[in-house]
Amino acid sequence: NNTLWSWGGNGDGQLGLGDTSQRNSPVQVGALTDWLYLSSGYKFGIALKTDGTLWAWGQNTYGQLGQGNTTSYSSPVQVGALTTWEAVAAGKYFVLAKKTDGTIWSWGNNDSGQSGQGNTTDYSSPVQVGALTTWDTISAGGGTTDGTCEVVKTDGTLWTWGSGGNGRLGHNNTTSYSSPVQVGALTTWSKPMAGNTFMQAIKTDGTLWTWGSGTNGRLAQGNTTDYSSPVQIGALSTWNILPSTSTAQSTGMAIKN
């Protein structure tokens, strides 16, 4: 019914309930019934409404709430006044969002260049990543100082930027990039998922691929080796859904058809 609910720790107002008290069971955030999509970072939340507006709340140390300041908010506050937001993905301390015109925007922590601006400056308001209008599916991930973005374009190409540690950007190196860089030359990518120290993606043929840190066997290659270029997980072609969350550190998950 498009209502929004939250529970758990609330020291920075990340539950959006107007206070900082812990909740041990689900509590409705306001009374609205027009919430469409939700993403959460570390102690903050950001959500899209059916009218195309974007709202954020919780911790705001790096400006990740997009308010032009670093003040924390314990109730949802609108990000600007636009009604053209279409998708949103939260990393640990930053946000990546897409508009209906196919542009992508970022703000918050930028220690590893994850804002895609060609620098490592933090931004407390949305800034456009390049000038392209052909971005399709977005994902954001990474930890405290190693944020990453993974995005598929409408032409099926895959692009990544941010921290390159463990080869997590898929460029056959461990270099960090502060602007989008294409992963290989393929045009068959469909669904991305940026984790904490690794990435996953599904191709249009239903195969599942991964790269980055292999610690704990999270790349499903039968070992704990790091891979700096995409490697296929098994031989199946029936993978369909990746997690909407992008904060996974030690585990990989996917759903088959």
Place the predicted regions along the sequence by residue.
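Surface loop/turn motifs at the tips and blade-to-blade linkers of beta-strand repeat domains
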Residues: V29-G30, V79-G80, V129-G130, V183-G184, ...
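Tandem repeat domain/solenoid detector
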Residues: N1, D34-Y37, T50-T53, T84-A87, ...
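Conserved core positions of repeat-based scaffolds
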Residues: S6, F44-A47, A56, S75, ...
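Short coil/turn segments at the loop-to-beta-strand junctions that recur within blades
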Residues: S21, L32-W35, T71, L82-W85, ...
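Short loop/turn segments immediately following the C-termini of beta-strands
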Residues: G9-G11, K43, T50, Q59-T61, ...
